[in-house]
Amino acid sequence: MKHPQFLPTWSWRLNWDTIRHDLTIGSCPRGPADLDRLQAEARISAVLSLQHDECLEKLEIDYPRLARYGRAQGLRMEHSPMRDFDPEDQRRRLPEAVRILHDLLSQGHRVYLHCTAGINRSSLVAVAYLTWIEGQSLDDAMALLQGARPEVSPYWDAYEGCGQDLIARHADQIRQRIAELSRQNPGRSAKIHRSRAEREMIRTALIG
């Protein structure tokens, strides 16, 4: 798949779309007034920023100050930076972001997940969470995301590469699980057992 790119005419504006009751994706808040608006209009209780320092500097965002303000307003403020337009960096950093998103959602937060434009990195983390943690199919997860925010466009190299890394790291446990599944369900194909074992191991590796 093609990598997403910003249009030359892209300029920042605060915008968001509600994916479901507990997850909203959008562009970055740049100051306290933006957090106030998100809290009042999107009714969020937590913010997960994926912006790298390079993004913050380019947009002149004082993230420590913004985070302090958000916490003072009762928001849970989390930061898991990923480099923009860098699928290799996103591949490495994706597990941490998925873990944080899971932690927030499992505690009942209404999460505002954002990168800079709310197109690439935020959708990458969302689709990884929906498929790897919640067990949705990739088609269903993307239909959910694009149904609410049509412009989302994750780096598939990062998504697939991270999944491959997790599988390779736990190859022995996956083989053991395949053997268990084969004994329990001898009538099913090895392909089905492998797919299930890999899905289970990715989820376990991410959240235990």
Predicted feature residues:
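Glycine-rich nucleophile elbow surrounding the catalytic serine of serine-hydrolase chemistry
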Residues: 119-124
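Short cysteine clusters
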Residues: 115
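Cys-dependent protein tyrosine phosphatase-like superfamily
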Residues: 1-111, 125-208
